C-alpha cells in the first residue's frame, strides 16, 4: 500500500481543487449596525443550468489516522462545500483527473472550524471527520442528472499525518 502524507491546508495549496473556507483576518465589511462582521464570498460555487444550490446536513462517522483511502468520487454537475457545524477537523483527499482516472493524490487536514469547497468534477475522498463524529452543512447541487461518479482505487492509499 502506498503512503500519502497529509500536508498543511492553505488556500494556495488547495486552490487547484477548490477553496479553503476560513475566517482569515478582519471581516470584509460590517453589517447589522456594525454588530456583525461579514467575511464575503469565500467559495466558487458552480452548478450547471439545470441544478440549483441546496443545503443539506451530513452526520459523518469518525475516522482515525492513518486512514485507508480506497474510494474517491466526483460531481460533474456542481461543486460541493463542506462546513463543519461542531468544529470537528476532517480529512480532505483530492486528486487530479487523467482521462477519467484520479491521479496525483494530495491529502489535507482541516483545522477546527475550517471548511472547504471542492470544485466541480474534482476527485475527492468521502467525508472523513478525524477523531470524533462530525455534523456538516453541505452546499451542493440539487437537480436532475447524474452528479455522482465513484472510483474504487485498485491500490488503496494509506493516509498519514
Swiss-Prot record:
Q: Which GO terms describe its molecular function?
A: ureidoglycolate hydrolase activity; ureidoglycolate lyase activity
User: Hey, what's the signal peptide range on this chain?
Assistant: none
Q: Which UniProt keywords apply?
A: Lyase, Purine metabolism
> What's any GO biological process attached to this entry?
allantoin catabolic process
Catalytic activity, reaction form? (S)-ureidoglycolate = urea + glyoxylate
Q: Top enzyme class of this protein?
A: lyase
The record's Pfam families line, in alphabetical order, gives: Ureidogly_lyase
So what EC number does this one have?
A: 4.3.2.3
Described function: Catalyzes the catabolism of the allantoin degradation intermediate (S)-ureidoglycolate, generating urea and glyoxylate. Involved in the utilization of allantoin as nitrogen source.
Stated family? Belongs to the ureidoglycolate lyase family.
- Report quaternary structure and partners: Homodimer.
The name this protein carries in UniProt is Ureidoglycolate lyase
Source organism per UniProt: Rhodobacter capsulatus (strain ATCC BAA-309 / NBRC 16581 / SB1003)
Amino acid at each position: 500500500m502506498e503512503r500519502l502524507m497529509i500536508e498543511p491546508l492553505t488556500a494556495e495549496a488547495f486552490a487547484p481543487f477548490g477553496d479553503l473556507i476560513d475566517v482569515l483576518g478582519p471581516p470584509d465589511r460590517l453589517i447589522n449596525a456594525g454588530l456583525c462582521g461579514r467575511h464575503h464570498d469565500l467559495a466558487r460555487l458552480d452548478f450547471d443550468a439545470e441544478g440549483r444550490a441546496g443545503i443539506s446536513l451530513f452526520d459523518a462517522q469518525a475516522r482515525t489516522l492513518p486512514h485507508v483511502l480506497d474510494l474517491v468520487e466526483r460531481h460533474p454537475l456542481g461543486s460541493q462545500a463542506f462546513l463543519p457545524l461542531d468544529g470537528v477537523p476532517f480529512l480532505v483527499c483530492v486528486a487530479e483527473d487523467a482521462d477519467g482516472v484520479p491521479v496525483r493524490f494530495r491529502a489535507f487536514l482541516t483545522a477546527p472550524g475550517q471548511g472547504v469547497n471542492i470544485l466541480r468534477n474534482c476527485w475527492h475522498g468521502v467525508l472523513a471527520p478525524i477523531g470524533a463524529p462530525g455534523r456538516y452543512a453541505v452546499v451542493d447541487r440539487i437537480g436532475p442528472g447524474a452528479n455522482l461518479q465513484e472510483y474504487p482505487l485498485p491500490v488503496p492509499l494509506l493516509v498519514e499525518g
